[in-house]
Design a protein with these regions (language model features):
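Non-catalytic, structured segments within soluble enzyme domains
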Residues: 1-149, 153, 186, 280-284, ...
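Conserved catalytic neighborhood of penicillin-recognizing serine enzymes
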Residues: 1, 45, 109-118, 124, ...
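Surface-exposed patches in mature extracellular/periplasmic domains of secreted proteins
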Residues: 14-16, 90-97, 133-139, 161-171, ...
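A penicillin-recognizing enzyme superfamily signal
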Residues: 141-164, 173-175, 185, 190-196, ...
C-alpha cells in the first residue's frame, strides 16, 4: 500500500532521486553527492562513466564491494555494472571498454570518528519510522558516548594484542540498559576496513549461550535448579553430542550443569521439556528464527545476531519483561516537527517471577564458579558463555542490575580460532568493559525485589 501511495504522489525520477539522496554508499557516505565527494573528490555531476558505475555497484553491498576495503572486488563489481548497462542499451560496447580501460583513482579513506557502526544501524532502522521524501531529520538516540568509547577501546585493544596469536580477526560488542536501550555498539575491528556490522548483521551459531533458553523452558515447565540429570554420553539417532574435553560427572543438578556448560545435560533437558518449548522460548525472548527443532537445538545451532542474543538476556535483567533492543528516542524535522517519539513504559511480561529468580541464581553461578569466572566482575553478575563447533565463534553475554552486554569473537570466513572459548577472551573483554562502565557501583543482586504480573502456570 505504501509503495502504491508513493507512486501516486511522485514520478519515477523523483523516487529515484529520493533514494539516491539517502542510500548508504559505504565509508560513512549517505547519498550520491556525499559518496561522489568521499570516493572521488568531485561533485556527482562531474563523475566519469566508470566512477558512476562503481558507485552504482556499491549499492548491493557497500561494505564488501568497497574500493577502500577491497579494490579488486570493487573493480570486478564495476565491470559487472558496465556490462549490464551495455546489455540494457544505455551505453555502447566501445564506451564500456573505454571506461574499463581508463578506470579511476579513489580518494584515501577518511579519518572517521564517532559511533560509525551504531550510526549505520540507525540509518537501517529509519525506514521503519519515516517515508521516502521526508525532510532532513534530527534524530535523538540512546547512545552513551562514554560507554561507546570504552566499548571500542576494550574490543580493539583485545583484538590487537591477542587476536593474532589466537587466530581471531573480528569481534563485536553490544551494551544496553535492561529495557533494551542500546548504549554502545561496536560492529567490528576497524570500520574503515569493513563496514559490515557484526553486531546487527552477522548471523552466527551461539553455541552454549543458547542453553539460556533450555534453562528457561525447563524452569517454566516446573523443573528447579536443584533437580538432577545424568551427565553421560548420549546418542540420538546417529548424533552423539560430546562434552568439552569428553569429561562427564554422572548425576548433576541443573544449576551445576549450566554453570559448567555440560552438553549432555542440556540435550537431555531439551528432550525432557520438548524441543518445541525450547524453540518457543527463544522466539519469545526475541530470536528472529527460524529456530531449528532437531536434537541439536540445545547446543546452539540456530544462527542469531549478537544484538538479538543480548536482547534476550536483557529480559532477565528487566525482571522478566520484554526488552527488545532499540536505539531511536525521537525524530524531528529540521523545523522541529516531531515525526516519532518513543513511548516509555514497562514491557509485556514474558517470564514468571519464580522463573526469573531461579535463572538469576543459575546464571550467577556461571560467573562465580562456572565457565565465566574470568569475567572477574566484583559486583553481582549473571551470564552464559558459548563456543560454536570447532571454535568458529566464542561468546559471552551477561548482565547486572544496571547493564547488559554481549561480546562475540570470530572470523568472517568462519575459519576456526585457536581454541578460543566463550569463557576466555569474550568473558575477559566483557569484564573489562563492565568494570569501566560500572566503576565502584554498589549493585543490588537481581534475585530479589521481583515485581508481580500474570504469566503461564507452571507444569512439568
Amino acid at each position: 500500500m505504501l509503495a502504491l501511495r508513493i507512486e501516486d504522489q511522485f514520478t519515477k525520477d523523483e523516487i529515484v532521486a529520493f533514494y539516491l539522496n539517502r542510500v548508504y554508499f559505504g565509508a560513512g557516505a549517505y547519498g550520491l553527492e556525499a559518496a561522489s565527494r568521499r570516493y572521488f573528490g568531485r561533485p556527482a555531476k562531474n563523475l566519469t562513466l566508470y566512477q558512476a558505475a562503481m558507485l552504482a555497484g556499491l549499492l548491493r553491498s557497500p561494505s564488501r564491494d568497497n574500493p577502500h576495503s577491497d579494490p579488486d572486488r570493487a573493480e570486478a563489481r564495476t565491470a559487472v555494472v558496465l556490462r549490464a548497462m551495455v546489455e540494457a542499451g544505455h551505453i555502447s560496447e566501445a564506451q564500456a571498454q573505454a571506461a574499463n580501460k581508463a578506470k579511476t583513482t579513489v580518494m584515501p579513506p577518511p579519518e572517521l570518528s564517532g559511533p560509525r557502526y551504531f550510526t549505520d544501524w540507525i540509518v537501517d532502522l529509519l525506514p521503519n519510522y519515516v517515508t521516502v521524501g521526508q525532510d532532513d531529520l534530527v534524530i535523538r538516540t540512546t547512545i552513551d558516548g562514554e560507554l561507546q568509547d570504552e566499548a571500542e577501546r576494550v574490543l580493539t585493544s583485545a583484538l590487537a594484542k591477542e587476536g593474532p596469536a589466537m587466530g581471531v580477526r573480528q569481534g563485536a560488542l553490544v551494551a544496553m540498559a535492561p529495557d533494551g536501550a542500546v548504549k554502545a555498539l561496536v560492529g567490528g575491528a576497524d570500520y574503515r576496513a569493513s563496514q559490515f556490522n557484526r553486531a546487527t548483521q552477522a548471523k552466527r551459531q551461539p553455541g552454549s549461550t543458547f542453553k539460556l533458553f533450555v534453562l528457561l523452558a525447563a524452569l517454566e515447565h516446573g523443573y528447579r535448579p536443584t533437580d538432577r540429570f545424568l551427565d553421560a554420553p548420549i546418542a540420538l539417532g546417529g548424533w552423539k553430542p560430546r562434552n568439552y574435553r569428553d569429561q562427564y560427572l554422572g548425576q548433576v543438578t541443573i544449576g551445576d550443569a549450566v554453570a559448567l556448560s555440560l552438553n549432555s545435560v542440556a540435550v537431555r533437558m531439551s528432550e525432557a521439556v520438548g524441543r518445541g518449548r525450547v524453540a518457543a522460548m527463544a522466539e519469545r525472548l526475541g530470536l528472529k528464527g527460524p529456530v531449528r527443532r532437531d536434537p541439536s537445538i540445545a547446543l546452539g545451532v540456530t544462527e542469531t545476531s549478537l544484538l538479538e542474543l543480548t536482547g534476550a538476556f536483557a529480559v532477565l535483567a528487566n525482571k522478566g519483561r520484554a526488552a527488545a533492543p532499540y536505539a531511536i528516542l525521537e525524530i524531528k524535522t529540521r523545523k522541529g516537527q516531531v515525526v516519532f517519539k518513543r513511548r516509555h513504559g514497562p514491557g509485556a511480561r514474558l517470564l514468571r517471577d519464580d522463573v526469573v529468580r531461579d535463572a538469576h541464581g543459575v546464571l550467577n553461578a556461571v560467573t562465580t564458579r562456572g565457565t565465566a569466572r574470568r569475567a572477574g566482575l566484583p559486583q553481582p553478575a549473571y551470564g552464559k558463555t558459548g563456543t560454536s563447533q570447532d571454535h568458529r565463534d566464542a561468546w559471552f553475554v551477561g548482565y547486572t542490575s544496571e547493564l547488559v552486554a554481549g561480546v562475540w569473537f570470530g572470523n568472517d570466513d568462519r575459519k576456526p580460532m585457536k581454541d578460543v572459548t566463550g569463557g576466555e577472551l569474550p568473558a575477559r573483554v566483557w569484564g573489562a568493559f563492565m568494570r569501566a562502565a560500572l566503576p565502584g557501583a554498589n549493585l543490588k543482586p537481581l534475585d530479589s525485589d521481583q515485581d508481580e504480573g500474570p504469566a503461564p502456570a507452571a507444569r512439568r
